[in-house]
């Protein structure tokens, strides 16, 4: 898979960009803050419908405009598709495939598969569980695009159930102070809660089963990737930690356990069981304490948790290994994703640079950003684009300066 053409309009610092790309290695070179990363961010957004830098779409729309546009023509095993996405301030985003509008933007998921490694990825090791859940879900929907709908349904039900818990909790607190029965609203919320328990368990079981299957497939690639980057270090491993607690047998979340046909039904049953156990605590606190939104991906070096104990170099290697494992998994599924490396070579020592360059050389297409050409390993033959931002009366605008080809002897 490779991106043949990229178009941007009013995306971040780019007022207009039309870029033809090719398989192999392409490097965007320029000072920090001049718009290089915005190019990779746009492609990442077309791939995942989210940014690796911000949690909302507003910063992606260039200041002073109300709409941003990103489009890419993707070639995969000889088949060419063009995906377009409009980001609209205060309105729903719109997407097209080969100029035909889609009902929902998520219908473009799976057309462009990317794996992006950026400095922000250190949060995969050192950050909150939400960073690791997002990593899993983006990789999961890249492999199985229909899981985006499952995740959206789960989040919709979660919001509704959380609102009911707050209503029920507030009503019970007021009635206990007054020595009377729960209000009509509180009683209605309690009666409705059981219905939403069923919806939450149904969608949550599908999402949880998908994540567990993913971790099973991902684990050997992670161990291999980390070994190639840090052969002298302790072995790296991952394990899914579920909020279902004692309702779920420990062996069920073991990465070595192969998924089975009855997993979703089993998980739904255990989900409902744990919701029943936690009902009073959830009402008291007014939040949903059970479900995939409370889970984590545990990272270990040997028997030690990576978070809080790994050195800076080990943390970098683990974060990079998670991305490279995702790349290897998508490749094993049958198609090379586009590999994108955002200003990462400067952060790595010589050994890790060589290991990463080896993967990049083997990818069908790799897009790299660097502040200076010397940050890119010599063994990478690259097409290079210079990038510069200029101050104008319409704000700071990024431009492509020139295209050059580097053919250094490695």
Curated annotation (Swiss-Prot):
Belongs to the RecF family. It comes from the Bacteria. One of its GO terms (molecular function) is single-stranded DNA binding. ATP binds at residues 30-37. This is DNA replication and repair protein RecF. Signal peptide: none annotated. GO terms for cellular component: cytoplasm. SUPFAM superfamilies: P-loop containing nucleoside triphosphate hydrolases. GO terms for biological process: DNA replication; DNA synthesis involved in DNA repair; double-strand break repair; SOS response. The RecF protein is involved in DNA metabolism; it is required for DNA replication and normal SOS inducibility. RecF binds preferentially to single-stranded, linear DNA. It also seems to bind ATP. It is found in: Cytoplasm. Pfam families: SMC_N (PF02463). Keywords: ATP-binding, Cytoplasm, DNA damage, DNA repair, DNA replication, DNA-binding, Nucleotide-binding, SOS response. Gene3D superfamilies: P-loop containing nucleotide triphosphate hydrolases, RecF/RecN/SMC, N-terminal domain.
């Amino acid at each position: 898979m490779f991106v043949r053409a990229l178009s941007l309009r009013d995306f971040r610092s780019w007022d207009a960009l039309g870029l033809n790309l090719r398989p192999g290695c392409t490097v965007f070179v320029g000072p920090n803050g001049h718009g290089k990363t915005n190019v990779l961010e746009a492609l990442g957004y077309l791939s995942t419908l989210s940014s690796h830098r911000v949690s909302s779409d507003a910063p992606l729309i260039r200041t002073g405009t109300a709409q941003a546009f990103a489009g890419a023509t993707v070639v995969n095993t000889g088949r060419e598709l063009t995906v377009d996405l409009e980001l609209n301030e205060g309105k729903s985003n719109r997407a097209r495939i080969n100029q035909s509008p889609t009902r929902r933007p998520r219908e473009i998921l799976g057309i462009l598969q990317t794996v992006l490694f950026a400095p922000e990825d250190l949060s995969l090791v050192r950050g909150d569980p939400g960073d690791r859940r997002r990593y899993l879900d983006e990789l999961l929907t890249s492999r199985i695009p229909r899981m985006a709908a499952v995740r959206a349904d789960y989040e919709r039900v979660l919001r509704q159930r959380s609102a009911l818990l707050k209503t029920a909790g507030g009503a019970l607190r007021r009635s206990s102070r007054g020595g009377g029965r729960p209000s009509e609203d509180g009683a209605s919320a309690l009666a409705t809660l059981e219905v939403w328990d069923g919806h939450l368990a149904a969608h949550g079981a599908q999402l949880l089963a998908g994540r567990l299957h993913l971790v099973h497939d991902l684990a050997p690639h992670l161990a291999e990737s980390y070994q190639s980057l840090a052969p002298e270090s302790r072995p790296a491993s991952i394990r899914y930690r579920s909020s279902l607690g004692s309702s779920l047998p420990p062996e069920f979340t073991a990465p070595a356990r192969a998924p089975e046909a009855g997993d979703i039904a089993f998980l739904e049953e255990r989900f409902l069981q744990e919701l029943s156990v936690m009902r009073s605590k959830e009402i008291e606190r007014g939040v949903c304490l059970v479900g995939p939104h409370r889970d984590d991906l545990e990272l270990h070096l040997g028997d030690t948790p990576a978070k809080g104990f790994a050195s800076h170099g080990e943390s970098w290697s683990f974060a990079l290994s998670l991305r490279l494992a995702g790349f290897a998994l998508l490749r094993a599924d049958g198609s090379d994703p586009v590999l994108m490396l955002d200003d990462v070579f400067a952060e790595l020592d010589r050994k890790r640079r060589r290991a990463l360059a080896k993967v990049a050389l083997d990818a069908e297409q790799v897009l790299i950003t660097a502040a200076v050409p010397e940050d890119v390993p010599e063994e990478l033959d690259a097409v290079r684009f210079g990038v510069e931002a200029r101050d104008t009366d319409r704000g700071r605008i990024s431009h492509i300066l020139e295209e050059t080809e580097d053919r250094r002897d490695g």
